[in-house]
Design a protein with these regions (language model features):
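Residue-level signal for inorganic ion chemistry
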Residues: 77, 140, 232, 332, ...
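A charged N-terminal "starter" segment
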Residues: 4-12, 22-169, 439, 449-454
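Flexible, glycine/charged-enriched surface loops at secondary-structure junctions
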Residues: 94-98, 271-274, 423-430
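Hydrophobic faces of well-ordered beta-strands that scaffold small-molecule active sites
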Residues: 70, 101-105, 129-131, 149-151, ...
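Active-site loop/helix belt of alpha/beta enzymes
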Residues: 43, 63-66, 107-124, 142, ...
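C-terminal accessory subdomain/extension
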Residues: 21, 35-37, 42, 47-50, ...
Length: 454
């Protein structure tokens, strides 16, 4: 059963015992919602000390459930949405209407929990939501979200009725899709035409009609009396390449192709509706792409995309400060003193160079600890970074806590995120293994409970 909990609690300084807290939470499972109130102890787990003898396994204190969870900060998420909205609607710009924000909640909300994140963002003022598929859109709609939902990767044949039934706005990326959508829309009891958005392929060569096919599209649309074009979009291939480069030039060319095609569409008498092309990177660095609506993805969750160290990127981060939304946590479930020359983990890929204290964490790659972090990454323990050693297992991870005085069994460990005054950001963790932040965030698996805290 996949569980999500909505809760709040009071933080206490490290080392202080906290009273048991009465908290209400909501569990989401298989589309059903069950409200519960439960007393959950916030006291520190029983203390244990490292084994005195090399090789002796220390006793694990009794804990309720498997100690791995992801804390999702509703206040940080709200902060990021408001920061983005203000950023793309500068006070000195003269616009009749403010730019809209379409919050991307695909991929289970970048691992944060799509339906729950969408509810928080709707309350915070998001205008639209973006999902990958009709099934994702239905989950968000069933969570009670009322704002428009755009299905970004279009739809499969046979899904048209679900789109209409759940009031989901599809993206059309092939002219042939219009006829099937129009047939289903003609059966609706509503007299208003069914709205869709058109995707143009301006250089990514993935999805979308070519700008040279605009005339064909306009001709096909004229035959579909039950459809209405509600918006036009494209997607950038390299907008995170801030510094002058081949990739930066590609983005400029994509912008040019898009706006030329848009003017052709208008010349053919077709109102494009809401124009949108700015993704996270373009929001941060390319104001000329903001148009009528922007589509923040990873920046909603607290991170600027890519890892280009250019001055332009640094300036974007200064102008648009974000707060990390998710912290992935676990606990130390075992401590072991090992001598120098001891192999640790599968294949003994890590061999100690000195007498060491090895901690075992109750989380592995089956939870979202990237397997590539073995021997390359670190975790946050008591405000210090402890290296991950050996190969990351499916269910556990080993760390070297020799340099973390007083580390105990039951100790809370932050894989990435925020722990009090200390931060171990996911983008730095991603950079250490040569991947992108979204890869880490989306890897948090279904068996990890999400705790929505304020």
């Amino acid at each position: 059963m996949l569980c999500f909990a909505l809760l709040s609690f009071t933080r206490h300084p490290r080392g202080e015992s906290a009273p048991a807290a009465q908290m209400s939470y909501t569990i989401f499972s298989s589309g059903k919602t069950m409200a519960h109130t439960q007393t959950i102890s916030r006291k520190a787990p029983p203390r244990a000390h490292p084994a005195k003898d090399p090789g002796k396994v220390t006793k694990t204190p009794r804990m309720e459930g498997r100690p791995v969870w992801a804390e999702v900060s509703g206040s940080a998420l709200t902060h990021n949405l408001h920061a983005i909205r203000d950023f793309v609607n500068p006070a000195d710009e003269q616009r009749k209407t403010p730019r809209l924000v379409l919050s991307i909640v695909k991929g289970n909300g970048y691992g944060h929990g799509g339906p729950q994140v969408a509810r928080i963002l709707e309350k915070a003022g998001s205008d639209w939501f973006g999902v990958t598929s009709a099934s994702e859109g239905i989950e968000v709609r069933k969570a009670g979200v009322q704002k428009p939902i755009l299905v970004l990767t279009s739809f499969w044949p046979g899904e048209e009725e679900n789109l209409l039934k759940h009031d989901l706005t599809p993206v059309v990326h092939r002219c042939e899709q219009l006829a099937a959508l129009n047939r289903v829309a003609s059966k609706r009891s509503k007299r208003d035409p069914f709205s869709f958005h058109l995707k143009m392929d301006t250089g990514m060569n993935r999805l979308g009609i070519s700008p040279t096919d605009v005339d064909c599209f306009a001709g096909q649309l004229a035959k579909c009396s039950h459809l209405q074009l509600g918006g036009v979009l494209t997607h950038f291939a390299s907008s995170e390449a801030f510094a002058p480069s081949v990739q930066g030039e590609q983005t400029r060319e994509q912008e040019e192709h898009f706006f030329v095609a848009l003017e052709r569409l208008r010349a053919l008498g077709v109102d494009p509706g809401i124009v949108h092309l700015a993704n996270s990177a373009a929001i941060a660095a390319r104001p000329e792409t903001w148009a009528d609506m922007v589509r923040p993805g990873v920046i909603l969750y607290g991170y600027h995309p890519g890892y280009d160290p250019s001055e332009m990127r640094a300036e974007s981060e200064r102008k648009l400060p974000l707060k990390p939304v998710m912290s992935l946590r676990t606990r130390v479930i075992s401590l072991r003193r090992v001598p120098a020359g001891a192999g640790v983990g599968y294949g003994a890929k890590f061999v100690t160079e000195r007498p060491s204290v090895i901690g075992v964490l109750a989380a592995g790659y089956g939870d979202g600890v990237h397997r590539s972090l073995g021997g390359r990454g670190c975790v946050l323990v008591r405000g210090k970074l402890a290296p991950i050693v050996g190969i990351v297992s499916m269910d556990v991870t080993m760390i070297d806590v020799t340099e973390v005085p007083g580390a105990e069994i039951g100790e809370v460990v932050t894989i990435y995120g925020v722990d009090g005054e200390h931060t171990h950001p996911a983008n730095q963790v991603a950079r250490s293994i040569g991947t992108v932040t979204s890869d880490l965030l989306c890897a948090v698996s279904a068996r990890v409970p999400r705790l929505y805290v304020s």
